[in-house]
Amino acid sequence: MVTLKTAVTIDTDKGDIVIDFAGSSGPSPYGINVVMNYTHAYSTFAIRSCLDPELPNNFGSLAPIIVTAPEGCIVNCKYPSPVNARHVVGMYVAMPILKALYQVMPDRVLAEGSGAVWTIQIQGRDLAGAAFTSSMFNYSGGMGARRTKDGPSATCYPTGVAAVPIEVLEAAMPILFSRKELRPGSGGAGAARGGDGQVIAWRMRTDSEWLLNAVTSRTHLAPEGLGGGEPGAPGRFLINGEPVSSARKLVMQPSDEVTLETPGGGGYGKPVAFREAAE
């Protein structure tokens, strides 16, 4: 369990916005530690996207936003802490900041989203015996709802990274997808609904064992709603229909089927608001 404790204050004398990560977890032995420039980037993005998304991204707009974190903590790690999967924690940096801003500008923030993108990497041999190693590919869950707008489905905040089309992946390696679709109802209910996650399923076209490295997110703690909105559905990582919680590299059999069900975003506002408006 990783704790991100965040305080957002405004210095009325200097006009600065100060974001402090004091109290955050210490460094992890796994590669999920985050360097300070990554933390700074996602922190300032969260502030700027609420204040004015059209602000130019330059020194003048960034200077009043001050980000601090204890040296050596998980969001300000130091060498030799491993950082290869830093997105697993780093993509959550914006969430506690948005919760703090909700107290003063509830119409500008969004509910919790699906968190970090799910990343996949595969190694093995094709039917001809030739070795292959895939590049890392990823899938997003749903974004949290805004006060007056539903959250976009299969879209990650704060990255907005796009996925490689399955046709490209099938042409590049011996993989065969059987499903790539939205996950209806996974977004949290509310006056505005959270975005839905997605379902992806595949098998490998091989007669040899193969290796799967899947880095998932939010399979236990669902994205929270805001203002009475309901949480989105947590994600599920399945092998042959059975849930898997391990993030280690897995040895897979030729006939194994992998299914990813990414989380839905949290809803915003009480769901009853829909019925009251209809009446």
Predicted regions and their residues:
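Glycine/proline-enriched, intrinsically flexible loops and inter-domain linkers
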Residues: 1-279
